Structure formats: C-alpha cells, structure tokens
Amino acid sequence: MSFKKIFVPLDDSELSHRVFSQALELALVDRAQVMLFNCVTINSLGETAVPIPVDLGMNAELMNQAYQAQRLRLESEEKHASGFLKNYCDAAAKQGLQVEFDCKMDGDPGHSICESAQNWGADLIVLGRRGRTGFAEAFLGSVSNYVVHHASCSVFVIQEVKAEK
C-alpha cells in the first residue's frame, strides 16, 4: 500500500519528534506530499476569543481585559506553533519532500484534525498517542481515539514510550 498525501498533526512535545520522524520515513518511501498541522486549542467557553455581553453582570472593563489577554495568548500560541512547524517543514524539505504546514484555532483538536485532513485530501494521518487510560482518558478525552474513529482515511498511531519504573 502506498500513500501520496500524509497529514501529520504535531505539537511541541517529545512524542511529536517521534511522530515526525516516522511520518518522514513513510513519506520518503513513496515520495508523498506532507502536511504538518497544529491545532491551537481554545479549552472552554471562558477562554473563547469572542467578547461576552456586559449584561451578564460582569464589569465591561474587566471583560475587555480578559478578552484582550485571551486574544494575546492565542496569538502567542499560534506564533509558537507556526515556528516549530516551520522548523519541521525545513527538515522535511531537506529530505527532498514536498511539505507544507497549517495551524488552526479550534476548541476540538480531534474534529479539526479529521476535517483538515479530509479537506486536504490526505490518504494517511500519522499522529501520536499519549497513552491515557481509564479516568484520565474519560475526563481529558483522547484525540487519537477520536481521529481513529472519525477520520476519512487510514490512521497510523505512534504510542508514547513510557519510562520504566
């Protein structure tokens, strides 16, 4: 089986370095195009970048300050993500691969990954899994689990290596 368009969601973690290396190996086999991707996550309604109406009993100036702080945080995270994605892009380009990157702000990284991969026409998604189980997975969710069950293409999951006790 060969892959022509490999979609690779990354963050700035050690696991993402392994995911990138594995995706690069796969891409080199078939000279596949690569899309590197990051989703800057808006975690909750309290962190949205949308102003909240003053009639909720909140001081307008405080709400504006909170909104501005959130906007600056999101801009900073997007700039940081674009920086490390560009570094990954440069490394892939040195291997002779056709590579690009995209960064989106979204409250749901799993959905954003699936939607962006489908819109790009990916035939493979390579992503990492941190290995949460039980309550941690139920509480915090699992992006990789969501992607495996909702992606419109094949998914290759790289498991995080746990340190031995």
Feature locations, PLM:
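A short acidic, glycine-rich active-site loop
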Residues: M58-G83
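Structural beta-alpha unit
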Residues: M1, I42-N43, E75, K79-I125, ...
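Solvent-exposed polar/charged
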Residues: E25-L28, Q118-N119, H149
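Small/aliphatic-rich secondary-structure junction motif
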Residues: S2-Y67, A93-Q95, E100
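Short, hinge-like loop/turn segments at secondary-structure boundaries
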Residues: P51-D55, Q118-W120, V143-S144
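Glycine-rich, Arg-bearing micro-motifs that act as flexible, cationic patches
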Residues: S2, D12, L127-H149, E160, ...
